[in-house]
Curated annotation (Swiss-Prot):
This is Cytochrome b. The lineage of its organism: Eukaryota, Metazoa, Chordata, Craniata, Vertebrata. Heme b b566 binds at residues 97, 196. The cytochrome bc1 complex contains 11 subunits: 3 respiratory subunits (MT-CYB, CYC1 and UQCRFS1), 2 core proteins (UQCRC1 and UQCRC2) and 6 low-molecular weight proteins (UQCRH/QCR6, UQCRB/QCR7, UQCRQ/QCR8, UQCR10/QCR9, UQCR11/QCR10 and a cleavage product of UQCRFS1). This cytochrome bc1 complex then forms a dimer. It comes from the Eukaryota. GO terms for molecular function: metal ion binding; ubiquinol-cytochrome-c reductase activity. It is found in: Mitochondrion inner membrane. The gene is MT-CYB. A ubiquinone binds at residue 201. One of its GO terms (cellular component) is respiratory chain complex III.
Amino acid sequence: MTNIRKTHPLAKIINNSFIDLPTPSNISAWWNFGSLLGICLILQILTGLFLAMHYTSDTTTAFSSVTHICRDVNYGWIIRYMHANGASMFFICLYMHVGRGLYYGSYTFTETWNIGIILLFTVMATAFMGYVLPWGQMSFWGATVITNLLSAIPYIGTDLVQWIWGGFSVDKATLTRFFAFHFILPFVVSALAAVHLLFLHETGSNNPSGIPSNSDKIPFHPYYTIKDILGALFLILTLMLLVLFSPDLLGDPDNYIPANPLSTPPHIKPEWYFLFAYAILRSIPNKLGGVLALVLSILILAIIPLLHTSKQRGMMFRPISQCLFWLLVADLLTLTWIGGQPVEHPYITIGQLASILYFTILLVLMPITSIIENNILKW
């Protein structure tokens, strides 16, 4: 008699995705981030659900309802901080996952890669709207500044911004719709993640060497299930250390001041995980140019497969490309730092140089380096 997991319609899908899935035998810990992102998503949906039970999306009571969750709801404080810091862990895993894809040439699976980019945009939109909900000073002014960027779109910009706001400024209508979208989008992310996996399982996983691994595959369970559990333990340990010892480390103190349209905070900035894009936005004096650069800073990932000029897939055996990759990482860390600094000398210049370097590495230096490395191989 055949095992039920191989015959039952539902169990068969799970079996082919997580149990009997043929997996390359040499994938490293960098391949753990996919499962960690799944855990982050589940954690965010669960903590978010419990927060939504006590939260009110009205400008007069939103801030108080968050305070009520932290003070009066049983274990409300831990749920709130797990949700806030869970978002930070989510983005750490996301950026590691994308970085892994860039380093090892996983972007050659174009369908999987493109769905991944859509996922990244959706998660960023979800996180942005979530940051508005506590209705603190940074929530209000962050929402005002970022939504206002759409007014740079020629002809329809102003009307579009007012349509999104539901009025002439960020107000009650904006908060209510942001809460509705923030609630529904994680489920859209879940569906997209399923499609992401579907496309991945059409081709099978990449591996560190970049060489086809059809001749050397092992079952996902128990080898990689146990490895994923270890990764999950590290993730939960890091998250709980953040939540229990320094829950406000990554947040902004201004968000503990209730939103006040009459008082602008000295430095308006988004959460740390958007600072690199915010720095690129601020580097360009022109409003429309800044918005385009902001969108392109993420959308540039979509043309990476077209710029792949190397004869090898990953960077494992390409030392010059490796140096460029880590220069890109250092550049992104510099941009993140600049995004959190006030707009004054020398930060403006550093930000502009880092922004130029970011696009230059991806669009010019990496393709040229790959061609040079191809020629070195001939010697």
